[in-house]
């Protein structure tokens, strides 16, 4: 299975501490092992799945798209304004 990362995902991870980067790496690995564990979103984000995890007391979300042989990670961030930022990125990249 091939794994690809979009630039917002890479930029967010690059700015974080090493300990948080390792946790993100573990969460990405969990997602690649069973990519269909998360439910698909509804509405205009229907092709995306979102994986949720906690770091400290903060909830973070990872948005990804899963197809037969590849996983494409789009963005990662705290729950606050997450879907708004994802939609903005899709409009600008669109």
Functional labels for PLM-detected ranges:
Residues 1-27:
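Arg/Lys-rich, positively charged N-terminal/basic patches that mediate binding to nucleic acids
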Residues 11, 30, 81:
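Active-site micro-motifs of SAM-dependent methyltransferase domains
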């Amino acid at each position: 299975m091939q794994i690809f990362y979009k630039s917002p995902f890479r930029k967010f991870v690059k700015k974080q501490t090493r300990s948080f980067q390792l946790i993100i790496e573990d969460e990405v690995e969990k997602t690649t092992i069973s990519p269909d564990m998360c439910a698909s979103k509804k509405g205009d984000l229907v092709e995306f799945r979102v994986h949720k995890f906690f770091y400290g007391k903060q909830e973070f979300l990872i948005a990804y798209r899963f197809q037969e042989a590849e996983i494409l990670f789009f963005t990662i961030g705290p729950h606050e304004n997450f879907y708004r930022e994802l939609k903005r990125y899709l409009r600008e990249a669109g």
